[in-house]
C-alpha cells in the first residue's frame, strides 16, 4: 500500500508519509505536520 504523500487523501495521520499528518476537517488530505 505505502503511505500517502502531500495532498493525498487520508482518514488518519497513519495513512500519511513521515512528517505529514491528515487534516481533521474536509477536505481530508495529508499536510505537513511541522516536523523535519
Swiss-Prot record:
<feature type="disulfide bond">
    <location>
        <begin position="16"/>
        <end position="30"/>
    </location>
</feature>
<protein>
    <recommendedName>
        <fullName>Beta/delta/mu-theraphotoxin-Pv1</fullName>
    </recommendedName>
</protein>
<feature type="modified residue" description="Phenylalanine amide">
    <location>
        <position position="36"/>
    </location>
</feature>
<keyword id="KW-1015">Disulfide bond</keyword>
<keyword id="KW-0738">Voltage-gated sodium channel impairing toxin</keyword>
<feature type="disulfide bond">
    <location>
        <begin position="10"/>
        <end position="22"/>
    </location>
</feature>
<keyword id="KW-0528">Neurotoxin</keyword>
<dbReference type="GO" id="GO:0005615">
    <property type="term" value="C:extracellular space"/>
</dbReference>
<keyword id="KW-0964">Secreted</keyword>
<keyword id="KW-0800">Toxin</keyword>
<dbReference type="Pfam" id="PF07740">
    <property type="entry name" value="Toxin_12"/>
</dbReference>
<keyword id="KW-0872">Ion channel impairing toxin</keyword>
<comment type="similarity">
    <text>Belongs to the neurotoxin 10 (Hwtx-1) family.</text>
</comment>
<comment type="function">
    <text>Gating-modifier toxin that targets voltage-gated sodium channels. Inhibits the inactivation of Nav1.7/SCN9A.</text>
</comment>
<dbReference type="InterPro" id="IPR011696">
    <property type="entry name" value="Huwentoxin-1"/>
</dbReference>
<feature type="disulfide bond">
    <location>
        <begin position="3"/>
        <end position="17"/>
    </location>
</feature>
<keyword id="KW-0027">Amidation</keyword>
<dbReference type="GO" id="GO:0090729">
    <property type="term" value="F:toxin activity"/>
</dbReference>
<dbReference type="GO" id="GO:0019871">
    <property type="term" value="F:sodium channel inhibitor activity"/>
</dbReference>
